[in-house]
């Protein structure tokens, strides 16, 4: 513990020294990060964070017939189907915030909430289409990316072991004012991480990244921060490689999104979330590569493998019949 504190102290001192020696780069990175937050992050994310928590609070515990078969396949507790809407429409980290709020309200057990984190935190369509439509000559590429993103997240929900637990416990939801206050706190945390990582990327771009091939440079930026990674994809000339990189970055979310999620989720372990993101990244890379190289047979094979794994997981975990809410 003492050694870790010592290393943190050295790192903080080194960071302050870098800021003093090259303040212009830090200021440029901070300005770029603030502009990114004002122009893209806040408009595409803040309304979805508020609506995601309100939606999950209003519908949590209520059965949504069209989504119930999907919930059963994903081994979700009965009554939590509304979290899928937040997971696939809200954007990072709206899905994780909705799961965390359900856990904090006592509607979800800790184990169920931690497992849901593995596939309920994804890029939203507002961000995905806003970022990717200008990157590809055909708008169909953006739809393909979204489809692969959703399919890989669903695959994670099937592949990660678990069993359908008891229905959610209905709790009285918080006030709308409390929801908005919480959303503002989450939004401020998200923007702080975006600005910090934009400064880090500015230093790396100035000192190291310009030496690397464009594909590697874009991949490194995407692993650090998703928005900047997507903006840097124009450096990659091959549209096929660009789509594969974009698919992987959207699935992984980047270190910045991970820190946003960790900061927004309290009282839950993140091990299953990390595992889920790695699995989603692998699935997205495989499916996007199959799509751009026209290896369409990979998709049915992928479906068969996931289906077989579903049967195996049911045998391992047992089939529990949930009681209706």
Regions found by a protein language model. Give the residues of each.
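N-terminal membrane topogenic signal
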Residues: 1-10
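Selected transmembrane alpha-helices and immediately adjacent juxtamembrane segments
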Residues: 10-21, 30-42, 46-50, 143-212, ...
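Long, highly hydrophobic alpha-helical transmembrane signal-anchor segments
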Residues: 13-64, 119-141
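Transmembrane helix-loop junctions in multi-pass membrane proteins
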Residues: 20-31, 56-63, 130-132, 200-212, ...
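Alpha-helical transmembrane segments of polytopic integral membrane proteins
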Residues: 44-52, 61, 95-99, 125, ...
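Alpha-helical transmembrane segments of multi-pass small-molecule/ion transporters
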Residues: 48-49, 100, 114-172, 260, ...
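Transmembrane helical segments that form the transport core of multi-pass membrane transport proteins
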Residues: 60-63, 180-250
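Alpha-helical membrane segments and immediately flanking helix-loop junctions
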Residues: 73-136, 220-235, 244-279
């Amino acid at each position: 513990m003492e050694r870790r504190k010592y290393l943190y102290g050295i790192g903080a001192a080194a960071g302050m020294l870098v800021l003093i020696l090259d303040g212009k780069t830090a200021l440029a990175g901070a300005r770029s990060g603030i502009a990114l937050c004002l122009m893209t992050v806040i408009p595409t994310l803040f309304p979805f964070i508020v609506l995601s928590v309100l939606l999950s609070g209003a519908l949590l515990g209520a059965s949504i017939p069209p989504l119930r078969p999907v919930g059963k396949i994903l081994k979700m507790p009965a009554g939590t189907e509304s979290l899928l809407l937040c997971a696939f429409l809200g954007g990072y980290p709206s899905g994780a915030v909705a799961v965390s709020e359900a856990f904090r309200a006592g509607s979800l057990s800790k184990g169920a909430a931690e497992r849901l984190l593995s596939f309920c935190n994804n890029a939203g369509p507002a961000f995905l289409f806003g970022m990717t439509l200008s990157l590809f000559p055909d708008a169909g590429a953006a739809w393909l990316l979204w489809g692969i993103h959703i399919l890989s997240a669903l695959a994670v929900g099937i592949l990660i072991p678990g069993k359908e637990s008891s229905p959610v416990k209905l709790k009285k939801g918080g006030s709308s004012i409390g929801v908005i206050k919480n959303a503002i706190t989450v939004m401020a945390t998200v923007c702080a991480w975006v600005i910090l990582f934009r400064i880090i990327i500015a230093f790396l771009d100035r000192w190291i990244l310009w030496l690397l091939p464009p594909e590697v440079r874009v991949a490194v930026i995407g692993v650090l921060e998703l928005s900047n990674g997507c903006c840097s994809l124009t450096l990659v000339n091959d549209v096929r490689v660009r789509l594969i990189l974009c698919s992987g970055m959207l699935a992984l979310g980047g270190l910045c999104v991970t820190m946003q999620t960790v900061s927004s989720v309290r009282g839950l372990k993140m091990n299953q979330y990390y595992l889920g993101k790695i699995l989603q990244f692998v699935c997205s890379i495989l499916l996007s590569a199959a799509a751009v190289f026209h290896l369409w047979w990979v998709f049915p094979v992928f479906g068969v493998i996931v289906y077989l794994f579903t049967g195996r997981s049911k045998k391992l975990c047992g089939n529990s019949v949930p009681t209706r809410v």
